Amino acid sequence: MLLKKSKLIGNQTIEISGSKSISNRLLILHQLFNNIEIKNLSNSQDTQLLEKALNSNSETIDIHHAGTAMRFLTSYFSIQEGKTVVLTGSERMKQRTIKFLVDALRALGAKISYLEKEGYPPLKITGKKLEKNTVTISANISSQFISSLMLIGAKLENGLEIILEGKVTSKPYLEMTLKILRTVGIANHWEGNTIKIEPIDSNNHVEKHLQNIPFIVESDWSSASYFYSLAAISRETVNLKSFKPYSLQGDSALREIYWDFFGVNTISEGAEAKISLLPEHYFNFPEKIVLNMNDCPDI
């Protein structure tokens, strides 16, 4: 294989698909409240599979390799009263544990059974009203298990209190979920090791608040990392559309990373939600880089 350095045409503008993490959370909320208009939805396969599953009337839902869809749909279908589904996936998906989430949902009163190996998909889920509103779950597991519970919390009669045990991993993803819930009008609090999602009641007209309000999904920062690398290597300016200066995504940390270690400055143009990646032409690159990527593993 022969690799040659290419000449990048500078100052081009590129539009990246919406954030998968934000899109998947909004799809669940849209299905729960029926009146969220989502723009710039992610075109990722995971998001497409989740959207297809939410709109399906089939008794068997196959989400293939989409791990986020498996986790979010497990909680979603557990509160769909009177509906029974089998939630399955690829052979690889059947090797990925979902026990922590199922245990938490069962503790709330959900009716979920394993159809093959204990602790793993496929699942048989019979939707019902969940009577309990407090659950304890390990904090050092995938944040998607916890976010999955948070997304349905406001639909429970008394809301949901989640007690986290241990050190939290991927904290930015939990904060993202909480911020999205607040944006749609669902009150929540995170104090110490306890997350509280307030219920929807007669004084909290979330559906009315959301009516005809469009959500423009900011573009995906982890995907932007490739273009930051192009700017860093070529030392040419690259422009990216639909990125907000105050991002919900933990992966937006790449702005500081590429400035500190590669001399690529990020300039925001708020009116157009556009950012320009401007490389410093006389930058002294460090001999080595040491970074803690715990809060932004996708980059």
Regions found by a protein language model. Name each.
Residues M1-I299:
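Short, structured segments at the rim of ligand-binding sites
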